[in-house]
């Protein structure tokens, strides 16, 4: 039996960063990984997706090259090279994490871990024990109870990231972050993209006004949206010339409708990875939504913590990272000032979108006295120079004390602007603090300064 100060199950953004942080502060760590180092984010999520997003952005820029006085006599998308580049980026970053896991004090174990009891984890024939255990097993794609989801060509984001050709017609079920990013990417790649969403608007994490404007902007590029639509089934059918296709049947406002596709992407959310962990043997409480934790991410078992997607609180890679750092700090007896109430997020469609804090919908529902300040990319010098005039920023301010309550935006550099507001919000800053901060000219970030004055 191997004993260390800390066992971490999972080497995603939460697990590997926590392991390194712990080792740097003198703890011995056993980190266990059933698949590839880096977890879903690096291997099947954030990084490969964002690599494809960059490819799509280059295509979009080339399609409008004439605006910049560049005459192109056509161009060819070499999809195998696109996917090769994606894999090279993933492998380079994975190699870096594997090197990081060689830090003195860290023992990296490959295999599937499950609990024997509240202090012991088993991997194969080996047993590992520690003073504290951190569960960081992430999440997996969630498939809705729809007839036909097991048919060939009905896939999740994992399979789409390894697809070997660009589908002529792509139907996406779900208009959340995953669905919207892939809709944007494959539309740029040349697919005819249809998106079916049950809710009234896409991207519920965003202010509904911002989400609607983003959807309309992407729609102008040819993506077809069917909102407030419930998918009933997916079936194999044939085209007029006898080729196999998939037909998605859905209901929109009580009326039946269909869309034909070559590939159907299921993008209806994710579920915590808890299967096979034998949490019952450790006495850890959980539900289908995830492992129950307190504000320090401790489970009902004092020495066991759960961070990231597996606790179901916030399925973002950076949320997992900072939750893991916070847990290590608690184990070390160190206080930190990480503010988990300020959790920014970004959607890398083209154009991109981002948010932090309250939306206008939430503020209205709470009856909060607030002021909404708006800015537009079309009025910004740098945005005009870049030909990136589609965009809007909404900044919400408490009328009583001027504190910034939230920022939601779409358009070029939205994630950068939201990052700035996140830093201010984490310190309880006011609109006056933003107005007094000198902003570089010319930058798109000046939109924030202009609406703060």
Regions from the language model: what does each represent?
Residues 1-12, 166-176:
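Beta1/beta-strand and adjacent pyrophosphate-binding region of the FAD-binding site
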Residues 7-9, 113, 128-138, 173, ...:
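Short hydrophobic core segments
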Residues 48, 121, 272, 299, ...:
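Hydrophobic "anchor" residues
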